[in-house]
Amino acid sequence: MASISDIHQQLISKQRSAVEITQEALENINQLEPKLKSFICVTAEKAIAQARQVDAKIAAGEKIGLLTGIPIAVKDNICTRGIPTTCGSKILQNFIPPYESTVTQKLVDAGAIILGKTNLDEFGMGSSTENSAYQVTTNPWDNTRVPGGSSGGSAAAVASAESVVALGSDTGGSIRQPASFCGVVGIKPTYGLVSRYGLVAYASSMDQIGPLSRTVKDSAILLQAIAGYDPKDSTSLNVPVPDYTKNLTPNLRPKGQIRIGLIQETFGDGLDSSVLQAFTKAVELMQELGAEIQVISCPRFSYGLPTYYVIAPSEASANLARYDGVKYGFRASESENLLNMYAKTRSEGFGSEVKRRIMIGTYALSAGYYDAYYLKAQKVRTLIKEDFDKAFAKVDILACPTSPTTAFKLGEKSDNPLSMYLSDLMTIPVNLAGLPALSLPCGFDQQGLPIGMQLISNVLKEDLLFEAAYVYEQANNWYKFQPQL
């Protein structure tokens, strides 16, 4: 499937209609879903109706924006009015939001065509999209492997051309890690840049919505559309949104003007040799293109994982307390009384990983352990942010592999939660610090599985990430490779 800019040109030149483009996406979905299972819900009739409206505008001579008529997939933890939003959980089965999230409202206003809702690990808790109550999504490059998580459905949909672009959410790597595993581009924006109104909360101090796409430019265009201040979100940043496509040129700034720091702590045990090799070649190419490369130490980087697994479950245990079967979603039957109904509903409605994190969070927040765990984790979080601040005094961008490995086999880590958690080792510290980070393809391993490189910048420097990522992308052909489906 073509890029946003290519489809836009096809529409305004009347080479193709919005209905034809939407039908092509829906045909891809019908053909591939039995294998991939990227979508929980496909809104075919609604999508065709939206496409007809776009064609009517074009026929009437109205000027259309870049996203008008572009098929897009939305992760199923982002509320969509009139369309089920399950969060991949039994406890929200058949829940249809009565309101629209800010990001999807912006997309609808821009004329984008929503194809449906994509699969995810339940409430965003997972790194493989195996924790969904409804189905297991597979990797388009190898159907015996995971697509990553928790935005695995969105990443798989984009990689397989079921959708042009997609929205995901990222709490500890849930956009970037699946982007790496599926060979696409994914960006987690600065915390507060994109409104969280209508995003079902997991860990509110880290959750952030962002784009997934096949090219850097498409991610820049999509972020441009969804970013900006929203009074409905108390953590929304009231800052101007720059033109993210303005500096997208194939040439890097004059030699030495962009300084890239390689995070020393990311090259230890557990890093696959194929991932290290691909990343090293990518860094060498960036140096040839004019970047100044140096090694940077972030001493507390490795503390990110244990810190996250105290703070995120603590916030989740509070956020998920609202699901009790009273007003919406699943309700257990044959309860003896109200308290029994609460307990049965939550016991039957939540999956094992969600229960595990609720229990960890409740324990960390309990009276006897609050200071020892939660408060201490918040202090370490501050130290991690300080390490990043010191690093950005020396460099403009930090770089490391997105994940220590390529996509692992389905079921390989299901019985080993700690091994699963380690796949987000490189991405989690970024969320703790509220920084923006982008993953883009930088090669393949010996089995033909994609490898991702992560670029991290200081707050609100997404334009710099896009600029550097675009230069690298255009200097090679990784983004042109497609899975053979």
From Swiss-Prot:
A Pfam family found in this protein is Amidase
> What residues make up the catalytic site?
75 (charge relay system), 150 (charge relay system), 174 (acyl-ester intermediate)
* Disulfide feature: none
Q: Name one GO cellular component term.
A: glutamyl-tRNA(Gln) amidotransferase complex
Which keywords does UniProt give here? ATP-binding, Ligase, Nucleotide-binding, Protein biosynthesis
Tell me which Gene Ontology terms the entry assigns under biological process.
Answer: translation
Top-rank taxon, per record = Bacteria
Entry coiled-coil feature ranges: none
What reaction does this enzyme carry out catalytically? Answer: L-glutamyl-tRNA(Gln) + L-glutamine + ATP + H2O = L-glutaminyl-tRNA(Gln) + L-glutamate + ADP + phosphate + H(+)
- SUPFAM superfamilies recorded: Amidase signature (AS) enzymes
Q: What class of enzyme is it?
A: ligase
The entry lists its GO molecular-function terms as: ATP binding; glutaminyl-tRNA synthase (glutamine-hydrolyzing) activity
In short, the EC number is 6.3.5.7
Q: Which NCBIfam families match?
A: gatA
Q: What protein family is recorded?
A: Belongs to the amidase family. GatA subfamily.
Q: PANTHER family recorded for this chain?
A: GLUTAMYL-TRNA(GLN) AMIDOTRANSFERASE SUBUNIT A, TRANSAMIDASE
Q: How does it assemble?
A: Heterotrimer of A, B and C subunits.
What is the role of this chain?
Allows the formation of correctly charged Gln-tRNA(Gln) through the transamidation of misacylated Glu-tRNA(Gln) in organisms which lack glutaminyl-tRNA synthetase. The reaction takes place in the presence of glutamine and ATP through an activated gamma-phospho-Glu-tRNA(Gln).
This protein is called: Glutamyl-tRNA(Gln) amidotransferase subunit A
**Organism of derivation:** Trichodesmium erythraeum (strain IMS101)
